[in-house]
């Protein structure tokens, strides 16, 4: 779970309390092992994020996410499987995770790479 993620377990009550004063709706949120939730995503009540799933940054997740799938957007929609994501981006894998590079060392390394090593959208 990255920075700015909000996990909501209830909501919607204020809009109907003029008709039903004690109205409150709750839903448990479950985040399974190895799930990744991108920055500033909103996870709504009752949602399960499946094992190994990826939620793109800024997504609003209103429905459960199956295991090993990638979702994104508002509302979050299916993009691809995690395996398809890996295959699509494998050529851009710079393999620097876990090398304990300082920010200065990482910057120096990245500046030595040719342009085609970087992901383009």
Regions found by a protein language model. Give the residues of each.
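Acidic, glycine-centered active-site loop in nucleotide-sugar glycosyltransferases
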Residues: 66-67, 72-75
